[in-house]
Curated annotation (Swiss-Prot):
Lineage of producing organism: Viruses, Varidnaviria, Bamfordvirae, Nucleocytoviricota, Pokkesviricetes
Organism: African swine fever virus (isolate Warthog/Namibia/Wart80/1980) (ASFV)
Subunit structure as annotated in this protein's UniProt entry: Homodimer.
Localization of this protein: Virion
GO biological-process terms attached to the record: DNA replication
Function: DNA-binding protein that plays a critical role in nucleoid compaction, genome replication and DNA replication and transcription. Binds to both ssDNA and dsDNA with a binding site covering about 15 nucleotides. Displays DNA-supercoiling activity only when associated with the viral DNA topoisomerase 2.
Gene Ontology CC: virion component
Single GO MF descriptor: structural constituent of chromatin
Pfam families hit by this protein: Bac_DNA_binding
Site (DNA-binding): residue numbering on this chain: 57, 69, 72, 74, 83, 85, 92, 94, 96-97
Name assigned to this protein: Viral histone-like protein
């Protein structure tokens, strides 16, 4: 019972679509996307929030430390020890209202 894979726009397809829509060449589009990625990475390293219009929000969140705990192997029911996880940072990506409105 395998789920059908949703169609995905690849990076190269995205570059081609943007190039066709803006009438700019693909090399320039690729440089723009690469620059955008670097800017987002730099902002997140400095704990800055980034919003990409029309409404995708990137934030850095701190995930609390989790202590070691007892669990069980779901296949065998055998008890296992789950390791503790230290506090760490993660990126949270959220679609804002304008993006949700696009779907309705």
């Amino acid at each position: 019972m395998s789920a059908k894979k949703k169609p995905t726009i690849t990076k190269q397809e995205l570059y081609s679509l943007v190039a066709a829509d803006t009438q700019l060449n693909k090399a320039l589009i690729e440089r723009i996307f690469t620059s955008q990625q670097k800017i987002i990475q730099n902002a997140l390293k400095h704990n800055q929030e980034v919003i990409i219009p029309p409404g995708i929000k990137f934030t850095v969140v701190t995930v609390k430390a989790k202590p070691a705990r007892q669990g069980h192997n779901p296949a065998t029911g055998e008890p296992i020890q789950i390791k503790a996880k230290p506090e760490h940072k993660a990126v949270k990506i959220r679609a804002l209202k304008p993006v949700h409105d696009m779907l309705n």
